[in-house]
């Protein structure tokens, strides 16, 4: 499996979901929207994902599974795929990072690294 990224770009936007959170019970809910852009010259398919979620206490949760939100999408050359999901933390701040396992039009698997991104209650950090 190749660890290079054949021109796949990941964009992440996060949001604290206040109406589903309960700070008194140490339950902080975050939504994230991810856009996967295929800047390569061929179609790719997202096969699986791996996430490492770390809260402010250093507690780590590892999540692995097929596809994203029940799908293993094909992303055509020059196209993009956007989905939203969420996670719960015990603290008002945390970090997510991970990988997508994908394959190209020839069936060659490769890994797309998802750089760490912050989950934080608004105005909690300076």
Curated annotation (Swiss-Prot):
Q: What is this protein called?
A: Protein ApaG
Specify the domain of life of the species encoding this protein.
Answer: Bacteria
Give the taxonomic lineage as stored in the record: Bacteria, Pseudomonadati, Pseudomonadota, Gammaproteobacteria, Vibrionales
Q: Please give a single GO biological process term from the UniProt record.
A: error-free translesion synthesis
In terms of InterPro entries, this protein maps to: ApaG_domain, ApaG_sf, Uncharacterised_ApaG
Which species is listed as the source? Vibrio vulnificus (strain YJ016)
Tell me the ranges covered by the ApaG domain, including all copies: 2-126
- SUPFAM superfamilies, sorted: ApaG-like
PROSITE patterns reported for this sequence:
APAG (PS51087)
């Amino acid at each position: 499996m190749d660890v290079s990224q054949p021109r796949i770009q990941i964009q992440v936007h996060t949001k604290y979901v206040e109406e589903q959170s309960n700070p008194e019970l140490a339950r902080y809910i975050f939504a994230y929207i991810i856009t996967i852009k295929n800047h390569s010259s061929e179609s790719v398919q997202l096969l699986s994902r791996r996430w490492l979620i770390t809260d402010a206490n250093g507690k780590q949760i590892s999540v692995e599974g097929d596809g994203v939100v029940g799908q293993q999408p094909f992303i055509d050359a020059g196209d993009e795929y956007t989905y939203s999901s969420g996670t719960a933390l015990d603290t008002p701040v945390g970090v997510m990072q991970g990988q997508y396992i994908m394959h190209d039009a020839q069936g060659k698997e490769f890994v797309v690294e998802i750089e760490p991104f912050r989950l934080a209650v608004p105005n909690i950090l300076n």
